[in-house]
Regions:
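A domain-level signal for the structural core that forms small-molecule/cofactor-binding pockets
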Residues: 1-233
């Protein structure tokens, strides 16, 4: 973390076991050369995977490039958070502000580490900085934290905790952090029970947001307009 007058740059928010699907890759961040080598290896492996499923991908014009497409999608998009260097996050003094900072409806696209199916939904984040020595961050930086952890393989509970810990680490000397994710899972709609439209809600809270019934937690959920068991924006 570098400091420049009243600004601080944060570039280390990793809080997950290295190498796990929901953690950074062992060699992260990868160079362009390393990514190219990984794509080549993954392309070969996925071709063998299709062979095992008796898919004649080599002669099917719609599937002949599928192994490479899938490999590139994982490295460059779906799991990009495992391989890319995290963008610096700038934090600033709270300067006496002691209210809640809330960002709602942050788009989320992630992947379940169980079946490698898409998780799609929104993230709501709230935090309260200490008015004496707390830090606040630029609004878009919350989005960057979510992209960093979301572009990996994770179950929603793990992802909620990772985002919470990332925000908690960057917003130093905070009085509390709360993260709620509302998302649908393709592993529910496309396999098994095959039910579409079911949404999962997870919340991780610390500090003043920790206990039900307190003012800070109530204000956060009131801002999300929770009614009839669902979150309506």
């Amino acid at each position: 973390m570098a400091e420049n007058n009243r600004r601080k740059l944060h570039n280390d928010i990793e809080c997950v076991q290295t190498g796990f699907a929901n953690g950074a890759a062992a060699d992260a961040p990868l160079t362009d050369k390393q990514k190219a080598e990984m794509i080549n290896k993954a392309e070969k492996a996925f071709g063998e995977f299709l062979d095992a499923l008796q898919c004649d991908w080599k002669n099917d014009p719609n599937s002949s490039d599928t192994p490479r497409r899938v490999a590139k999608a994982y490295v460059n998009d779906l799991w990009a958070g495992r391989y890319n260097e995290f963008t610096d996050i700038t934090s600033f003094p709270a300067d006496g502000y002691d209210g809640i900072v809330i960002e709602r409806n942050i788009p989320l696209t992630s992947m379940c580490s169980h079946h490698h199916q898409t998780i799609r939904g929104v993230v709501h984040v709230g935090y309260i900085s200490s008015p004496e020595n707390g830090r606040v961050i630029g609004l878009s930086k919350l989005n960057r934290i979510i992209e960093h952890f979301g572009r990996r393989g994770a179950i929603q509970e793990q992802l909620t905790s990772a985002i919470h810990q990332g925000v908690d680490k960057v917003c130093e000397n905070n009085l509390g952090v709360i993260v709620t994710i509302v998302a649908t899972h393709n592993c529910v709609s496309c396999r098994g029970i095959k039910h579409s439209g079911a949404a999962m809600v997870t919340t991780k809270a610390s500090g003043v947001f920790r206990h039900n019934g307190n003012d800070a937690r109530q204000e956060f959920f009131d801002s999300l307009k929770i009614n009839n068991g669902g979150i309506h924006i």
